[in-house]
Amino acid sequence: MKKRGLAILIAVLGVLCVVCGALLLQGNSAPVTAEPSPSSTVEATPSPIPAETPEPASSQPETEEPYVSPIDFASLQAQNPDIYGWLRIPGTEFDFPLVQRQGDDSFYLTHDSDGNESSAGAIFTESAYNSTTMEDPVTVAYGHQMHAGTMFGKLQETYSQENALEDYGEVIVYLPEKELHYQVFAAVPYDNRHILYNYDCTDSRRFNAFLNSIYEVREIGAQFNSGVTVSTGDKVLVLSTCLAGDSQRRYLVLAVCQAEIE
């Protein structure tokens, strides 16, 4: 009897053990959900690429290159300080230094541009009437009418040709600090009056009176370029030499400044 009761007790305990084990196993097998880490759910945002900052514009103005004359005035003036400019007429043989002797305006009638005695003289302006800056209303450059063709010897021959005022219309004067470009507007026979003595061209009325005296010339050989206008305030260059066949009169070529390059 005792043995039978013990067996039942063992059987009951066994069943309890099985039931408890099953319950324990079921509780331990429930899935565990891990919480996501913040880094695994946030999409990575690319860092913005900084835009290139443009270079600030320079506030410094561009400096212009200083004018450099094609004429070597340093060498010329070392040889003769009276040389202040250079006269050139493209397409012709006129290519001479310009000289001026302070206090002796007749000097270059009998001396060349080196200052040596010469019957051909030089191309010169007068210090009593003109500066060496070419800023006067009218500048007169003189040169002999040499039979050999030197100096202004071919001036009348050149500008008496048909279309000469167009073909040889440009006259250039070079100075150490700038160059001036002139356009020929007249070439005329003229009387022997001293232009700058008789016409004070700093006075606009006298300036216009001088121009009128040019346009009134009606002689054979007078030529005019009607396409070139000359007005008060303009700068006029006159090339003056003896008239061929009449040394008591003058032959003039007149040009007006249209551009300065500095």
Describe these PLM feature segments:
Residues 1-13:
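N-terminal Sec-pathway targeting helices
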Residues 17-262:
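Solvent-exposed, non-transmembrane regions of membrane-associated and secreted proteins
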